[in-house]
Amino acid sequence: MEGISITKLLVIAVLIVLLFGTNKLRTLGSDLGAALKGFKKAMNDETPAAKKSDGVEAAPRVENKE
């Protein structure tokens, strides 16, 4: 059992290009890139908001000592 060789990957890539065409794949790639960029931006924008305090401090944690 070899797994997937480079020739098998190339054949799969050629079949995908033949089925969908280069224009459709280019559009799909740019849409995927824009989605990832938006996701990363949203994650970076959320981090400072989570760190910002509202002036309310959390109560210290109390452990049960028996």
Curated annotation (Swiss-Prot):
- Transmembrane stretches, by residue range? 1-21
Where is it chiefly localized? membrane
Stored Gene3D superfamilies? 1.20.5.3310
The highest taxon in the source lineage is Bacteria
Q: Which UniProt keywords apply?
A: Cell inner membrane, Cell membrane, Membrane, Protein transport, Translocation, Transmembrane, Transmembrane helix, Transport
One GO molecular-function entry: protein transmembrane transporter activity
Task: Identify the stretch(es) annotated as Disordered.
Answer: 46-66
Recorded GO CC terms: TAT protein transport complex
Q: Short name of one Pfam family for this protein?
A: TatA_B_E
The topology of this chain with respect to the membrane is: Single-pass membrane protein
Q: Where in or outside the cell is it found? A: Cell inner membrane
Does Cell membrane show up as a keyword for this record?
yes
Q: Give the family this protein belongs to, as stated in its UniProt record.
A: Belongs to the TatA/E family. TatE subfamily.
Q: What does this protein do?
A: Part of the twin-arginine translocation (Tat) system that transports large folded proteins containing a characteristic twin-arginine motif in their signal peptide across membranes. TatE shares overlapping functions with TatA.
Which PANTHER family is this protein grouped with? SEC-INDEPENDENT PROTEIN TRANSLOCASE PROTEIN TATA (PTHR42982), SEC-INDEPENDENT PROTEIN TRANSLOCASE PROTEIN TATE (PTHR42982:SF5)
Name this polypeptide is given: Probable Sec-independent protein translocase protein TatE
> What are the leading ranks of the lineage?
Bacteria, Pseudomonadati, Pseudomonadota, Gammaproteobacteria, Enterobacterales
